[in-house]
């Protein structure tokens, strides 16, 4: 037995117009449907309808985590900063970490993740291999002081996340926990009706050697990914790596200096030589994290990948300013590896290693070289994976052309290994009585992000189209003339019957025009609508509408409860 909610009492202030600052469909529709409200940049209140959906997502997550053998607990949001110093992450995390002092001058952080907290929690308790493996999780608000919060719930400063942490005695045991979590996450996406693709991902500040993200495919997604239709490979643009096919530059292989007046762009140089941009070499002048000058060279038709560059040049690397270019004797648009001024480190993309005929800047205004050859004409200090992989590049597994898409990261799994346990002294005794560091995994689901991802994938020109598993209510009963006794009586009869069947019902009993009610209910997106109109009541029928398909049918009043209950229960399965 459930209890119906009446819209005359429901706090769901809808909006007729799209908010000016809402870029994504999910942001726009959640605001318009009266489900969230912005309090400050990156900070949102979840109103009753959204909160019901959030709770449903949380319960799906709980069910899958519990089924996989994980145990729920709750750790504090406020974390002693000393734990972050132990792990070495307090400075590496940067300004996104919210830090503050308590009244006694002791420093704390607001947890964006809880690796340090959970490691400290178990390090004096999990002391024997007999206690392992253990997988602990909680669902909690997290905090990250994003430089540019945007896209509504997609990139906020406060967000809801489920984070889990496993502790194992062996790598094989970690792999088992990792595989369980991957399956649980696939199940969560399926049950929430999120079409997601598991993609190889970079581990970022969390660390570890192996990571997979679950990306909800969406044209307006904030993340880029590439995938192979032939073998199933997929990776986000931060982790995607392949041997980019490059074209040899123009010329006969002899180092030749060519005047290229005013041609300081790849496009202009390629056009001048009548050659594809892939046959040119793009030189980028950088300052690494230690403040030292670097020139990075990539194929002319590819871009330097920021995440990969951070691994090579350090977090905080940046492009040189015009003043720094002048200081180091470099000329924008004409930088190249030949005759590079002394003291500048040269790092080239791995895909260029076999190329022997480069078209590149000559380190002189209005001049380029053709036929430049590594080792013969210049020395490369380091070869590294630097470029963003794009559609058309070869799949690293099967060699077929990759496709590109955009997505929303809804969850991610990591094999952390011993990064935190070694740093924080979390050890156990193995079967041979030897002390070893705990082997860890961590697993996150963005609960509030998942809400946005559902809306991003399930909407139309009229509003949200909720999948039944996460809909705030399953059925909207819409009496068009609720003050009329006959209409009110039939409404009560239907509502009582649906509630008795365990159906979640919202009743639009507001004294508003039919058109207003129809528009609002379509905007809010409840899966089924039961409309009580004057003409239908005269004929002993009500109209049943499927929000997803738009299909309508007249159903006898005394049959509608059974009909709707059957539809809802079938959809739940």
Question: Where are the predicted features?
Answer:
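NTP/phosphate- and nucleic-acid-binding module
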Residues: 1-573
